[in-house]
Amino acid sequence: LERTMTERSVKRGEYLYQGDRDCTGVFWLRYGQARVFLISGTEKQITLYRLLERDSCFLSASCVIKNINFDVFIQAEKDCRILLLPANVYQDLMEKSFPLATYCNQILASRFSDVMWVMEQTIFTSLDRRLALFLLEQKAIDESSDLHITHEAISNHLGTAREVVTRM
């Protein structure tokens, strides 16, 4: 396993995964921060969840996960260092190890729960409340009351237009 894993650095703003353009494999974030998001046909974005230090991401191996019919994108929000397990090795391990498959399914279920929360918020919660919740979350992640984030970045997280965030 150790021989098949690679380690790489990803700069802030770079993509760790770009939907159907690649099948990277499973990665673990040694340090840094990334966002997992969708992009619509009109280039609108919405953040599904964030990856923080020591988080793993299985959707970057979606080409070997059955019935994943959507493309996610993963972009570094801060400089990152990742450990990468190739998709074919991951698939082989999943077929041979029931405990590993169970563990991975638990993480996927947790991420699905995160996505459903975003969906619920987007559909049933007013934008001003979603914006307030986002800013509080950002404050907690940054561990600072001073937030350095653009209206464009906020709108990408919330799945709305920059002009809407500016008017809020």
Which role fits each region the language model picked out?
Residues 1-31:
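Regulatory nucleotide-sensing modules
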